[in-house]
């Protein structure tokens, strides 16, 4: 029932409620029957305490405006339609105090200069997983850590990551995304088709939709057009498959190797060609997948390894079976065969089945150490290169994955929202050894490419160093 007119005119009011916070007071004329029936706090008060017979009650609250708005809502009066972060937290505190249903708001963004206020409000709410996440997500880079309890700092540090991600969406817009702060920021209005991160100079190499190549220095945030040709040496320590970035020496290599393979096979046809090339991390070897189609036999696939130093080309595999996902590992290569549904390792001129009966292998990658990761349509498999065995399997649906550390990966999965054809993306982090999700969030865009880059603000490292220094001081004293 709408009691808006009754409230505004003050008709039949039987209680003056005086709300008081630290700086303000506000008097409103209300009706005990409405408070009693709608708000459990007043139900208890009017049933069991002397206030049930009082014409005036003074009530200390966190914020007089917020509590007044809550009470007015039971009269059918709509109030703050665009609440800021502080209002939302004070509303949560007030609803909880009044014993009404409430949910702590997620993903609030607090200005750096208001972090002290956030601390005060969290102190009232109490420390729990959600409020500590809130503090971690909003901790200013230059905040004086000595003002915070060491136990709280440990909890905050455990929630930080030493990386963030760069994203290109399906509309070719580029974003930076922080998994800790859960903050998605469009970097520029320019559109891009592809990108790679080079750790040596802390640069993103970007191919724009106008075919031009740009570099963005992540330390200085300076974006400039790259006039010179991109060299393969720029991709040092990268597992490079297909790329939209034009690399002249790459194209020249393809043409040269294609001619050599055709000569090797004694066949030159318009129905053949290189389908993919993959570079070893040190750029000394190149894997080449070559396909030849013949009407009577269908598609035939070869896998060649080219040694850059000796200029020798070696055939290592041939089959009437599509080959993909070639990956260089310390003592050989790993690849996937589609019809036989096998992941195969080639090392010391010998073949070994790594995993069999795997449908739809999307990606094979590894941490440049021991852990090999095989991503299929419904799970990822962790394979130990040293022990030559599967150490874990995790059921999940991901489109693409990237290693963040030796144990942590980040992946994403695109999905349609229920009531529209809009595609959103779920970003998830996993500990590959335990199989546990360590973080996840949905973003309102369709991800086309995701690249992990280091956090140059070093927030996690700064927290860790400060905690260690305090612990050392305590031991010394």
From Swiss-Prot:
Pfam families: BTB
InterPro entries: BTB/POZ_dom, SKP1/BTB/POZ_sf
Disulfide bond residue pairs: none
Family annotation (Gene3D superfamilies): Potassium Channel Kv1.1, Chain A
SUPFAM superfamilies xref list: DPP6 N-terminal domain-like, POZ domain
UniProt domain BTB: residue ranges: 13-83
Family listed: Belongs to the mimivirus BTB/WD family.
Protein name, UniProt field: Putative BTB/POZ domain-containing protein R830
């Amino acid at each position: 029932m709408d009691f808006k007119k009754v409230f505004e005119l003050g008709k039949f009011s039987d209680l003056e409620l005086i709300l008081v916070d630290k700086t303000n007071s506000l008097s409103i004329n209300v009706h005990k029957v409405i408070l009693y029936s709608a708000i459990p706090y007043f139900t208890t008060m009017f049933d069991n305490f002397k206030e049930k017979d009082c014409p005036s009650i003074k009530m200390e609250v966190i914020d007089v405006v917020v509590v007044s708005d809550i009470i007015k809502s039971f009269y059918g009066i709509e109030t703050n339609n665009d609440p800021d972060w502080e209002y939302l937290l004070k509303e949560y505190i007030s609803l909880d105090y009044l014993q009404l249903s409430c949910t702590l708001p997620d993903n609030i963004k607090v200005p750096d200069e208001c972090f002290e206020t956030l601390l005060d409000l969290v102190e009232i709410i109490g420390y729990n997983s959600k409020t500590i996440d809130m503090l971690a997500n909003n901790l200013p880079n230059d905040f004086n850590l000595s003002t915070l309890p060491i136990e709280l700092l440990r909890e905050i540090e455990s929630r930080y990551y030493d990386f963030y991600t760069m994203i290109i969406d399906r509309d070719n817009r580029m974003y930076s995304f922080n998994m800790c702060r859960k903050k998605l920021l469009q970097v520029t209005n320019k559109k891009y088709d592809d990108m790679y991160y080079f750790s040596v100079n802390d640069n993103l190499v970007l191919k724009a939709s106008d075919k031009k190549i740009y570099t963005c220095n992540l330390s200085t945030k300076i974006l400039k057009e790259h006039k010179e040709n991109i060299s393969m040496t720029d991709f040092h320590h990268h597992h490079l498959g297909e790329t939209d970035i034009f690399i002249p020496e790459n194209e020249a290599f393809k043409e040269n190797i294609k001619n050599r393979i055709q000569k090797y096979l004694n066949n030159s046809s318009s129905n053949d060609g290189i389908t993919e090339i993959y570079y070893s991390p040190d750029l000394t070897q190149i894997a080449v997948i070559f396909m030849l189609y013949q009407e009577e036999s269908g598609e035939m696939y070869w896998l060649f390894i080219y040694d850059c130093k000796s200029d020798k080309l070696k055939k290592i595999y041939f089959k009437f079976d599509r080959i993909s996902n070639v990956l260089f590992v310390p003592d050989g290569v790993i690849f996937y065969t589609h019809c036989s549904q096998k992941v195969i390792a080639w090392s010391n001129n010998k073949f070994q089945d790594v995993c069999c009966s795997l449908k739809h292998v999307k990606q094979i990658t590894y941490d440049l150490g021991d852990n090999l990761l095989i991503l299929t349509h419904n799970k990822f498999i962790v394979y130990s290169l040293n022990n030559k065995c599967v150490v874990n399997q995790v059921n999940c649906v991901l489109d693409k994955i990237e290693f963040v550390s030796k144990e942590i990966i980040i992946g994403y999965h695109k999905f349609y929202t229920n009531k529209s054809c809009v595609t959103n993306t779920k970003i998830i982090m996993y500990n590959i050894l335990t199989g546990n999700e360590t973080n996840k969030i949905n973003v309102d865009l369709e991800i086309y490419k995701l690249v992990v880059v280091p956090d140059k603000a070093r927030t996690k490292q700064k927290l860790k160093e400060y905690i260690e220094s305090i612990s050392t001081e305590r031991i010394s004293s």
